[in-house]
């Protein structure tokens, strides 16, 4: 807002399970019950009840300091239904962290609930409006960097960062090292660890403890990767995989970046075999 960059509301989150024949989007009652038969489907109605109950009960975990209860155990103790786990909790968590759905039940329940609480996701009727930058993130980057754009070095990969008394030495590839007063490493933790010439034991322990996984990403126009009902289409579209495997998502870039195009441009993670 301070950069006076235009935004628009774009984020919603539907789930599509081709095997179970289920799809829904929680943005409205009409989208939630886009499949009218879900009005009479006991498992779906049970999932909706469990969502409301979870939103009411889960915040109590935040008052239990030091609780390391796994998410799966917390849900089992609360007797939450299978549909709630498979078609709500796991898809939401796997999509947020782009992680293997099978690992979600091992997440610390308190961490999971705190994230949902901090982002206003433990309520149904008063959720915050998630917004996207009009024209993409490049717009605010342009405005943010205007005062110092002439000092930005592009296409200059850094090989090493070395601490010196009273400063830091940065060694770009194929260039002489440059001394700075201070350096911020705005990159992934494993990359930061790889750049440090002399990491401390604490830095090795912390930066080396965060795992990453690769995701296969494809840009395409195959709308079969979106839910069957256009009413359910959204910026993020989660695919339930019957045989497990890494998280499978399709991002609708026309929605996320407000592309004025007759054909939907889609980005799919880890579901390449389904793309025509």
Question: Over which residues does each language-model region extend?
Answer:
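Mobile amphipathic helical/loop "lid" adjacent to a hydrophobic cofactor/ligand pocket
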Residues: 4-114
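N-terminal glycine-rich dinucleotide-binding loop that anchors FAD/FMN and/or NAD(P) in oxidoreductases
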Residues: 1
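Helical element adjacent to the flavin cofactor pocket in flavoenzyme catalytic cores
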Residues: 112-173, 178-181
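Short, basic and Ser/Thr-rich N-terminal targeting/leader segments
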Residues: 8-11, 154, 213
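Hydrophobic/aromatic-lined pockets within catalytic cores
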Residues: 79-80, 93-101, 145, 149, ...
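Mid-domain catalytic core of redox enzymes
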Residues: 156-276
């Amino acid at each position: 807002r301070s950069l006076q960059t235009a935004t628009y509301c774009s984020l919603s989150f539907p789930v599509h399970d081709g095997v179970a024949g289920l799809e829904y989007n929680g943005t409205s009652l009409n989208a939630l019950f886009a499949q009218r038969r879900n009005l009479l489907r006991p498992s779906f109605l049970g999932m909706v009840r469990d969502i409301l109950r979870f939103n009411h009960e889960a915040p109590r975990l935040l008052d239990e300091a030091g609780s390391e209860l796994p998410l799966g155990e917390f849900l089992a103790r609360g007797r939450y239904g299978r549909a709630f786990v498979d078609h709500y909790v796991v898809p939401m968590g796997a999509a947020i962290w782009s992680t293997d759905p099978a690992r979600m039940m091992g997440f610390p329940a308190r961490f999971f609930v705190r994230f949902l609480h901090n982002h206003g996701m433990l309520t149904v009727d008063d959720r915050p409006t998630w917004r996207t930058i009009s024209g993409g993130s490049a717009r605010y980057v342009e405005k943010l960097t205007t005062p110092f754009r002439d000092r930005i070095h592009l296409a200059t990969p850094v090989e090493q960062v070395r601490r010196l008394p009273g400063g830091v030495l940065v060694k770009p590839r194929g260039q002489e090292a440059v001394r700075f007063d201070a350096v911020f490493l705005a990159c992934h933790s494993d990359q930061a660890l790889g750049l440090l010439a002399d990491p401390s034991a604490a830095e090795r322990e912390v930066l080396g403890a965060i795992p990453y996984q690769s995701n296969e990403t494809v840009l395409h126009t195959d709308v079969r990767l979106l839910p069957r009902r256009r009413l359910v289409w959204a910026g993020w579209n989660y695919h339930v995989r019957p045989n497990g495997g890494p998280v499978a998502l399709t991002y609708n870039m026309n929605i996320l970046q407000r592309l004025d195009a007759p054909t939907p441009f889609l980005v799919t993670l880890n579901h390449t075999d389904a793309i025509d």
